[in-house]
Amino acid sequence: MFGGLMPAMVTPFDERGELDFEATEALVERFIQAGVSGISPLGSTGEATHLTFDERKRFAEEVVKLVAGRVPLVVGVGSSGTREAVELARHAEGAGADAVLAVSPFYWKVGEEALFNHFATVADAVEIPVLLYNLPMLTGIELSPALISRLAGERENIVGIKDTVTVYGHVVSVLQEIKEANPDFAVLCGWEDLVFPSLLAGADGSICAFANVAPELFVDLVNSTREGELQRAAELHRRVLELVTLGARSDPPIGAIKLAMGIQGVPISPAVRGPALPADEGAREDIEAILRDAGVLNPSKAR
């Protein structure tokens, strides 16, 4: 159920910084038309930590309605506290999400037993599938293959992981130590640079941020690799590596991603929530050049 390309969906805001559901609808339709295998809102790229609790619930409800069961919807429920993560997971299940994505707690640097209790408690609170989210570069905590294996072995509804790491060896370890024993456990790469090699090693797909900008490129990369068209996939991988350089044009990359989406003709404001900063308009030419070099700039829609 969980594989292929799933964009880590941005959260559109209007010029006043409020949730923009018209832009959200346009984005959902763009993803569906691009042939994505699922959508994952309210993660890091979705600025979930910059939203109020009520906004997170409202956005989840709206995206469930807009997707309308056409592709699996994996809603982020990450929180630094277990109780809040449980409430968000229960809400997502009640709203109609197909699964939830639970990131490591990200304030206290807790040990593996505390991490096990956190994820197990979230899994016990719902009946729908739970995907773990390993994001050590932001949380300061790396989920070890041993912990992942224990969670998957002791909780039937923990069915996969979004592994956002810069070290390829971690993905390989997860594949070797967990997926070989449990082929149904979904391994989804969250780091664009590693999508192609992860797929070659046996990963099921990707949940990634830059698919917001060029979903067709990432869908093509995943499908070409799966179908054994490796020469084509290698060229698509090169284009992905070019595309992700636009992330350096804002702090964090979300602002540059939203500006790039607007350049591509997506009706979305470049607005982000603090402490994130929007991309400077002076970066527009640089971003257009990157989109062109990556072979994804649509001149008829660029604005």
Walk through the language-model features, giving the residues of each.
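A general structural signal for well-ordered alpha-helical segments in protein cores
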Residues: 24, 56, 60, 85, ...
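Active-site beta->alpha loop and helix N-cap motifs at the rims of alpha/beta catalytic domains
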Residues: 1-7, 11-142
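C-terminal alpha-helical cap/extension of soluble enzyme domains
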Residues: 6-12, 34-36, 45, 203, ...
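Catalytic alpha/beta core domains of metabolic enzymes, predominantly
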Residues: 124-125, 137-241, 246-249
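Catalytic cores of TIM-barrel enzymes
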Residues: 1, 182-185, 261
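Short, amphipathic alpha-helical "lid/cap" segments that border enzyme active or binding sites
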Residues: 21, 25-28, 145, 284-291
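Alpha-helical structural signal in soluble globular domains
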Residues: 34, 58, 62-67, 91, ...
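Short secondary-structure transition/capping segments
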Residues: 51-54, 87, 112-115, 143-145, ...
